[in-house]
Amino acid sequence: MRKYIRESILIVVFSTLSPWLLAQQQFTLYDELPGIYKSYKPACSDDLPGWAKMLYQFPVNMTEISKEFDRYVLLHPTEKSAAIRYYKMWRRALEPCTLPDGTIEMPDAGRFYENLLHDQLEVRKNRETSQVTGSNWTFLGPKETFWLNESGSAIPPSSCPWQANVYSFDVSGSDNNVIYCGTETGYVNKTTNKGLSWQLAGQDYPFGGGVTAIAIHPSDPDVVYVAAGNQVHRTLDGGITWTPMLTTGNLFNADRMKIDPVNPLKILAASSNGVYISADGGLNWSKKWSAPAYDIEIRPNDNSQVFALTSANGKFSLIMSTDGGQTFQVQPGFPSTVVESSGGLLAMTPVNPNTMLAILLSANNTPYLLKGTLTGSAWTWSLQATGLSGSFPMNNGQGYFDLVLDISPVNENIILVGTTTLYKSINGGNTFTAVGGYAGNFNIHPDIQDIEMLPNGETWVSTDGGMNLTTDNFGIQANYSVRVNGLTGSDMWGFDQGWNEDIVVGGRYHNGNTSMADFYQPKALRMGGAESPTGWVLQGKSRHVAFDDLGNGWILPQYAEGKPEGRFIFSKYPNMEEYGGRRSNLVHHPSYYGTLYLGEGTGFWKSSDMGVTWDLLYNFPAKVRYLQISYSNPLVFYADIVGAGLCKSTDGGASWVQKPSLTSPPYGTANWKGKLFLTVSPSDENVIYACLQNGTWSADIGKVFRSSDG
């Protein structure tokens, strides 16, 4: 007989907690800023490394925490955890408002959301008054990523699930051909042919952030609710127009949304700020529970019963409503001793509405799968599986960031659950086998984001790489397919473009390096690599490209299905810092294609043999960022140096003079130093244009300066 969970899991509670832990709060003011999702933040713990403990402090010096993190990663290069994932998101959001000494200037988040709301309403207003202006911009790609044919096989490579990170999606219950999915980069994509092709829904509408939840009306696929940017957005016309539903004084970021199938005007949302409900199609919202909620479920066949997974005092808790979500009470039968580490999820199935599953990410990187059974009017809970075991190998992965759970709507014994790897059970959770990710037979991108099992036997899975479909719950390979054609939302950390050939390369967040070309379209190639802001086109030779995380350079194939034509020595790369927001560049001499310049470390380097060897021309006191060369006089260079700002050379880089006016009032400020983007007139070496990179939070956003005297 299976023992109840409170007898199966031994929780040791120390009577004396560390002074550090007692002094910490889960969230700081940083966690309230746009681009940071509080639900992904793991629980405060003594076991966290030093840099991770700093995430619970305020204020924090960016330089100090970055150094600590970088040292840690050198010692643990392959580690994945909720803390690492949260830090990367936290750092990316805060770097634009970091001063040279590492001080983080708190931006005005309220003004940001006010401006965002204004822009959202303006898009709708302009569309309604036919004031949307046309443009010559078209989508270049990646339109559909394919595997690189490294072996030269006669069989063309297949589509590759390494394209865009899809946080969430929903399949229309009234028409399974219609699906809406949302990306980490804030795009909503729509398909009407079951993912064979995707189109943007709301191309001109700024959703304001990653799309964390989507819910489609149960009988009308044109009515859709999307959670993104601390807002709930609604469309009534299939994604042509969108409306923000929350006022600036009542914003929240929903991680899960459910529409009542009996009363579709009722929408329930679980968020880091609690449980919210709307009874009028999203026009008005009220908070029904104040503690963070990770998931919400409406009991199949009884819409009066609503369940939400939440936490209290560092432990998981299940709350239940018997009046359709108007009021909630703590469910007494749910175990109250499971330590909450990084969130959890619930799952129910219409084939047996008296059963519920909960996956709880607990201490020591260990998830627990619980099973609830309704007997009479009481729910009883038992431990179904313990992670990091032979029968259930799953760990906590990256926490709530990549966590899924679902039960088949036609067979309660089929369960899919995952974090970085997806696992499947066909015996009700007694044993699990890996499906795909870091283990398993299916080539699914690691880091599972969302899942939906349908009554027709189809299962959709979204990952950091895109959308995946199986028609037999991952039974055989022939019934599995990648569905990323036209899926928009790749996060291009790196970018470079050819001159003589229309080649574009770049490193992508989550999805490695890609190569695109006019002679590959509509295909893009997966080149490999991880998450580097890299990618450089060598202009003088056909199809020669280089990526810092792939070793030597590549000679790309002549056509998308072809074999790469070889490798070549390329021994030095520009400074490239994570997220692509601060990187140097590769500069070509305008007259000699084999002569290259770049900034690596504090050095200004020159190669006369197309990157095989390099000579140090000058050593600056700090890192070299953006570079430019004058086409009209190739002896003239401009460089942006960390802590120094704009510098100029008139002798080919042998000597440099600081040009302080740009980074001094009344123009820019000292904060601009090391953050410049600049270009030089092709006809006049003394005419340059400059702006601030990543100036979203700055009062200098949108400012472009021109100098006509060098």
Tell me the role of every PLM-derived stretch.
Residues M1-Y30:
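Bacterial Sec-dependent N-terminal signal peptides
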